[in-house]
A protein has these predicted regions:
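Outer-membrane beta-barrel translocator/receptor signature
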Residues: 46-53, 61-66, 78-84, 93-94, ...
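Outer membrane beta-barrel
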Residues: 71-137, 266-273, 279-283
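Hydrophobic, small-residue-rich alpha-helical packing segments that form membrane-like cores
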Residues: 139, 143-197
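Bacterial N-terminal signal peptides
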Residues: 2-10
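Exposed, low-structure sequence patches enriched in small/polar residues
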Residues: 46-54, 81, 162-164, 168-176, ...
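Glycine-centered structural positions embedded in regular secondary structure
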Residues: 24-30, 135, 157-159, 171, ...
């Protein structure tokens, strides 16, 4: 924050004010909903009453832009207090500041859109880039304060990005986060949780060459992850010649690993083709990402191009993935992933899309010498989806037919007495009719699903009917739908009826009202009736 405050006078001195511009402009939006809920027959899945409030406020002062946002809601049955977040990111020319609950992204392997409560700055003058942040990534919570009954430590983090270039870019990133060991009482630390820390240094680059037909993308990182800050520290003689190890507080629960993704693409007119190599070593982790799969290596080939004067679009990719890079797992897994997509649109009335995907997984036992190289899993999953659309009409009526079909087959080729595979078939047909003068609309639909496996089958079919009407010079939209589905299992049959009504009324250019109500009734085993209703209002200023 000292850096930000020191920067403000410089920015103010460099500011050029347009005397004809409004010195202050304010705009934004405010909305809220109130919902009711009732369940009969089984346990309720949410509270009887709920609410949500959200708002945005944009203030412009002599070119400075200050956007504010806030959200408050109450949902679920185990929250003891409302959920509230607030953040602001004022911006002026190439300067952007952050305060409150914010998200920043440096790279995939350092800081990747994790939410923090704190402050930050982004500077982007011409081809130069600088970003920095500091804040709390998670607050301390005792086990009895958390809806999942699991305690968590207070976690603080900071990071920076330094980059150059526009067409060809080079970014150096750094991020560190650590849990506060003293943020939980001793009783909660007895759970199977440990204070963690991570330090990651990354390099990201994008370079175009060969008359911009070749594009090289690289995202590389090396990081140290400690899964228990309470573990014994390393002896000084171990890192005597590597002082950085001591500065970062490495201990016997620390691990040093790398990660990266490098891709090369060839682009000419509308044809693209490329290859990407990706590897995340075992033990690599950054606390700046919500989720990152480690111990994986993958190579992917991809291509896309049009034919028949752009009426036919073809694309596809094929990849090979494996884990157990250090041969320390009990079993190793390899996957082959392939997909192809064909999109054909001969006219504005007709379109056909075909997608095929093939996923195979192969797992072998590695460490047990008695069963070395024996196959544990050998499965292939085929999936085909075909979607067609046909539209026609005149000045009075518009018709639309859509049909989506899907087929999925899982084949189990593992060593064993039986095939554990399964099959799934989906069919969805929908017809829409619109009367342009009266603003009426009609929707008819039918669906069919058939699932079969070794020990069970499930056949489901149903129909949908709905109507829409536009009133008040298209300011009021009314919609009513009813859906019926029947599910047939070997030992029982269930019927589900679902009715939904909604109204959206645009009172003016700045005000809108929303109302919705729905009812779900299940007949058969575990019969129940569920009713929901919501009213909402939104305004712009």
């Amino acid at each position: 924050w000292a850096f930000v405050l020191a920067l403000l006078p410089v920015l103010s001195a460099a500011q050029v004010v347009d005397p004809n511009a409004d010195p202050v402009r304010i705009s934004g939006a405010l909305g809220g909903t109130l919902s009711g809920y009732q369940m009969n027959g089984i346990n309720a899945r949410q509270q009887p009453l709920g609410y949500s409030l959200s708002g945005t406020l944009n203030i412009s002062v002599y070119g400075w832009t200050l956007p504010f946002s806030v959200a408050i809601s109450r949902q679920g049955s185990t929250f003891s207090q409302p959920f509230t977040r607030f953040g602001v990111s004022p911006e002026y020319k190439w300067v952007k500041l952050h305060a409150g609950h914010r998200n920043l992204r440096f790279s995939e392997f350092t800081l990747n859109n994790v939410t923090f409560l704190g402050g930050g700055v982004e500077l982007r003058p011409k081809a130069f880039r600088f970003s920095a942040m500091y804040g709390m990534l998670q607050q301390a919570q005792r086990a009895d304060e958390n809806r999942y009954g699991v305690a968590q430590y207070k976690r603080m983090g900071y990071g920076a990005l330094l980059g150059l270039g526009r067409k060809n870019t080079f970014d150096l990133t750094f991020f560190r986060a650590a849990d506060d060991v003293s943020s939980l009482p001793l009783l909660d630390t007895l759970q199977r949780i440990t204070p963690q820390a991570s330090t990651t240094l990354g390099l990201r680059s994008r370079v175009q060459f060969a008359k911009d037909r070749l594009v090289l993308d690289a995202d590389l990182a090396v990081g140290a992850y400690t899964h228990d800050l309470n573990a014994p520290r390393l002896d000084e003689d171990i890192y005597a010649d590597r002082p950085i190890v001591g500065e970062l507080g490495f201990n016997y629960a620390s691990n040093l690993a790398g990660a990266g993704a490098v891709g090369l693409d060839y682009v000419k007119d509308k044809f693209t083709s490329g290859v990407q190599y990706r590897m995340v070593q075992p033990g690599f982790r950054t606390l700046g990402a919500n989720y990152l799969l480690s111990d994986v290596e993958q190579i992917t080939l991809r291509t896309a191009f049009p034919l028949a004067k752009d009426k036919l679009q073809l694309s596809g990719q094929f990849g090979v993935q494996r884990n157990n890079l250090s041969d320390r797992r009990f079993a190793g897994t390899a996957r082959n992933i392939g997909s192809a997509n064909v999109a054909y649109r001969p006219s504005t009335r007709v379109s056909v899309n075909l997608n095929y995907a093939n996923f195979s997984i192969y797992q072998t036992l590695l460490l047990d010498t008695l069963f070395a190289d024996s196959v544990l899993i050998d499965q292939v999953n085929h999936q085909v989806i075909v979607a067609t659309l046909y539209q026609y009409g005149d000045a009075k009526r518009q018709h639309s037919w859509s049909l989506m079909t899907g087929y999925q087959q899982l084949s189990d080729r593992s060593d064993g007495p039986t095939d554990l595979g399964n099959r799934l078939i989906n069919l969805n047909l929908q017809y829409q009719l619109r009367w342009l003068a009266s603003r009426w609309g009609l929707v008819l639909g039918a669906n069919y699903n058939d699932y079969s496996a070794l020990l069970t089958t499930n056949e489901r079919y149903g129909a949908t009917v709905g109507a829409t009407r536009m009133l008040k010079k298209d300011k009021l939209l009314l919609r009513l739908t009813h859906t019926w589905n029947r599910s047939q299992l070997p030992d029982r049959m269930d019927d589900i009826h679902s009715t939904h009504f909604s109204m959206n009324y645009r009172l003016s250019d700045r005000h809108a009202l929303m109302l919705s109500a729905g009812n779900i009734r299940r007949e058969g085993l575990q019969a129940f009736t569920e009713t929901r209703g919501t009213v909402g209002y939104r305004m712009r200023f």
